[in-house]
C-alpha cells in the first residue's frame, strides 16, 4: 500500500466567500445526463477521511474493490494538514487535497468513486461527491449516514426499499434501505451517474451491512493511517 504526504495546494480557498465562489464556478460542470457504469462490473472505489483536529492533521484513504466480488484490488492513503476550517456545507474543502492525493497514488484506475457524504444532496447542490467528480472527471456518488437538512418518508421495511430525499418538492437523492428494518442510507448523485444507478450500486455494495463495503474499508484504512501518523509524530 502507498502512503503519500500532502501539502495544501497553492491558491486553495482560505475564506468562506472564496470557497462558495469556487462551488458556484464548478457546479455548472456537474454532468447529470450519464447513467454511469453498470452495478457489479469493473472497479468501485471508496474514499473516506479521518481527522486529528488537535494536531491539524487529516488522513484520507482510497480502497479499490472488484465490483463483482467486492475483493480488495488496491488501496492507498494520504496524510496532510487540514486545508480549511470546519464550516457546514464547505466540508469538501477540508478533505479534497488528501482525497485527491490518495486517489492519485492508486496503481490502477478507480472506476466509480463512492464518497462517505453527499453529492447533489447539499444546500448548494455541490457536495464532496460532486466536487470530487468534477475535479477528477470520474463517476461519483455520495452515500451518507444521515439526511443532512433534507426530508424523507421512511422507506418500507424490506431491503431495497427507497423513498425520495427532498428539498421542498425537489428530489436531491433517495433514502435507501440496505438491511431489513435498519435505518436507511442517503444516496445522491455526484457526477456522471444517474440516481437510479447510484441506488443500485449502493445495494450491490451492501450485501451484509448497512454501509457500503467501500465506505467500511476506507473508513478503517484512513483511521489506521491517522493512528500511524500520530505514532510517527
Swiss-Prot record:
Binding site for Mg(2+): 48, 116
Assigned EC number: 3.1.21.7
Domain of life: Bacteria
Catalysed transformations (reactions): Endonucleolytic cleavage at apurinic or apyrimidinic sites to products with a 5'-phosphate
Gene Ontology CC terms, in alphabetical order: cytoplasm
Keyword Cytoplasm: yes
GO molecular function: deoxyribonuclease V activity; magnesium ion binding; RNA endonuclease activity, producing 5'-phosphomonoesters; single-stranded RNA binding
Main location: cytoplasm
Top-level EC class: hydrolase
GO aspect biological process, one term: DNA repair
DNA repair listed as a keyword: yes
Cofactor(s) required, per the database record: Mg(2+)
Record localization: Cytoplasm
Alphabetized HAMAP family for the sequence: Endonuclease_5
Family, per entry: Belongs to the endonuclease V family.
Function recorded in the entry: DNA repair enzyme involved in the repair of deaminated bases. Selectively cleaves double-stranded DNA at the second phosphodiester bond 3' to a deoxyinosine leaving behind the intact lesion on the nicked DNA.
Name of the molecule in the record: Endonuclease V
